């Protein structure tokens, strides 16, 4: 039930109740100054959620301005529900990634499920039909019973929601490191398709127009969810379980179809999802973006619980709700469309010209605040920054760690069993990735590929981030995150179009954490400019700490690419015996942050692998040209585990093998994680074309019809011999085996 008596404005100030809501003393004084009076309890709540990091990006906005956001094909950059990029033929791709980390740590099934629901609404509120979902997940070590529980429940929540709503979950990534034990990361991405003429904006335009509420009723779930997402997790966080929202994917499906029908009506003026901060953010942001105001009568808000206060209604984050603005006098048209889908559209207010959010309840004005103060004019901070001692120590090391390998085969099999490298089939077999029947490349390759019906085109999509590199060197790691995502798009035959990012970090009030955020956004910005991939939207999730210990800096990159002709679609699997195997790029003795270092030492240290963005760009462009020329049978990014793992992954499940000759020190050639490298196979008859197009390609060997990996050195000495079955057993069995463990 709600509070019996809300504190008075004076009590809010004197008892410093605003601190419990997340406002600092200085911020409360600023609210008082803006209003020219003390805010009441409800108004304090409005400011506390809108000025939370989750809604305002107050600690990160200064850094986000560094990102390139413009491009020839960008139709909508940051600022709306999702970004939009033109793909020709009057069509565009809409995509966005968001986090649901804190809710997933407390209530993993619903936290993950509602993360999927929220990102779907961001995309279809733009007028786009969602065509795919992806995710990026981080957990602690699977040897921990708590981690196994979180992992299983998060995957079940993603599957449960996505499968029911009828949108395929086609790809993503899952990584495991001890730093995520108490604070898993659950980032969900949605990709949608739209015709230019259907693009919508979340704006409340037209004085006198009607504000309507569509979708599920409002309950008490998720109250202060945005504030909860803007603080560190602790032992007490378990008590905040009621702050986690509960999703209904069947309601979402009805809402999706209703909204896509609504956008065909010229009676619709604006539409926005009620996401973080619920009615507060949707109303304040829609009015602020349009330079207008909104007056709402909360008596008309559909409520599923008795006795809800204005504070509770405005801060609820109940799921499957939309706020829309409709031309005055045409409300019935909207109601009829929505009713066709079994939903209600309720008139809750109107657009005004005074730039205020005015709330009425039981005949009284319960809040009257400037919309710009809530939205655009939230305070912005540039926190102090300090280089961490660990970074200085790593950088000053005179020599870098180089492993000594006693048995190459055992090392490869052990790497294939590492959960970060091992097959994620246990995860994606729970997802319906074929619903809508447009999925061309399923989970498990470098990028997922979804065709665009009625055209020869397809979209490649991926999520990527190696947070170990970012921990060792945030700036270099930021560059690598962008480059690896682009590499995966290119390996699928696509040209990278743009980026949506999810910046997952610790507490920015700690100078060392803010330094990580600052440096990694520097690296990301530079890579985006060099590779021509504008950032069209994203999300910031800070305070990812448990009892004062932060996660690694984890800026997850969501990237979409355009494949002009489905004939160019390429996968990582070797295709047929006789094809020639090439590696593009050279291996260097770079093991800092590598899977091998983690396997051997149990921890990471040293320097991240170096990256030259000009070389990266050249190799990507040349490989894409070779793919389009029909000279490439398979392509795979060389990433975690190095060349040896890439070779193994290229023959998993295929009735082929490989004979390879390496020239150089075995450990470096096979296991170093040097950047800007690709493993490709080339039809023998296309060898001349391939070699004329790709400069840095080194011929390693060829694909065989014997399912075995044979590696020799240039002197003919046997380096490794492993059957595909042995590798497959290690790779596929690792995660299911750990989940069955009772340790």
Swiss-Prot record:
Primary subcellular site in the record, as a coarse category: cytoplasm
GO MF entry, a single one: ATP binding
UniProt entry keywords in alphabetical sequence: ATP-binding, Cytoplasm, Ligase, Magnesium, Metal-binding, Nucleotide-binding, Purine biosynthesis
InterPro entries listed in its UniProt record: PRibForGlyAmidine_synth_PurL (IPR010074), PurL_linker (IPR041609), PurM-like_C_dom (IPR010918), PurM-like_C_sf (IPR036676), PurM-like_N (IPR016188), PurM-like_N_sf (IPR036921)
List of residues binding Mg(2+) 1: 98, 539
Magnesium keyword on record: yes
Compartments, as annotated in UniProt: Cytoplasm
Binding-site residues, substrate: 99-102, 121, 245, 317-319, 541
Binding site for Mg(2+) 2: 122, 273
SUPFAM superfamilies: PurM C-terminal domain-like, PurM N-terminal domain-like
Active site positions: 54, 100 (proton acceptor)
EC number: 6.3.5.3
UniProt pathway annotation: Purine metabolism; IMP biosynthesis via de novo pathway; 5-amino-1-(5-phospho-D-ribosyl)imidazole from N(2)-formyl-N(1)-(5-phospho-D-ribosyl)glycinamide: step 1/2
Protein function: Part of the phosphoribosylformylglycinamidine synthase complex involved in the purines biosynthetic pathway. Catalyzes the ATP-dependent conversion of formylglycinamide ribonucleotide (FGAR) and glutamine to yield formylglycinamidine ribonucleotide (FGAM) and glutamate. The FGAM synthase complex is composed of three subunits. PurQ produces an ammonia molecule by converting glutamine to glutamate. PurL transfers the ammonia molecule to FGAR to form FGAM in an ATP-dependent manner.
Protein name: Phosphoribosylformylglycinamidine synthase subunit PurL
Source organism (scientific name): Halalkalibacterium halodurans (strain ATCC BAA-125 / DSM 18197 / FERM 7344 / JCM 9153 / C-125) (Bacillus halodurans)
Lineage per the UniProt record: Bacteria, Bacillati, Bacillota, Bacilli, Bacillales
